[in-house]
Amino acid sequence: MIGQPAGIIERAFELAQRSANVEEIRFQLRKEGYSNVDGHLMGRKIRADLVKVIRRVA
């Protein structure tokens, strides 16, 4: 998989390790050119999992 961009969910979890909140992750994903960011991150479970990563690193 070298050279292939990360999928949006995988990239969201990478960003969670150095983000302050989910909105910051959304902003960065849009900036990186990912589409349908809100659709991918709207679920309660995915948001809760991202917050867990953010809090664990903080």
Language-model regions, residue ranges each:
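Short, positively charged loop/turn segments that connect secondary-structure elements
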Residues: 32-46
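Short Lys/Arg-enriched helix C-cap and helix-to-coil transition segments
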Residues: 39-40, 52-58
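Preference for short coil/turn "hinge" residues that link or interrupt alpha-helices
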Residues: 1, 27-30, 34-35
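Positively charged, polyanion-binding regions of nucleic-acid-associated proteins
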Residues: 2-20, 45-54
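Short, charged amphipathic recognition helices of the HTH superfamily
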Residues: 17-30
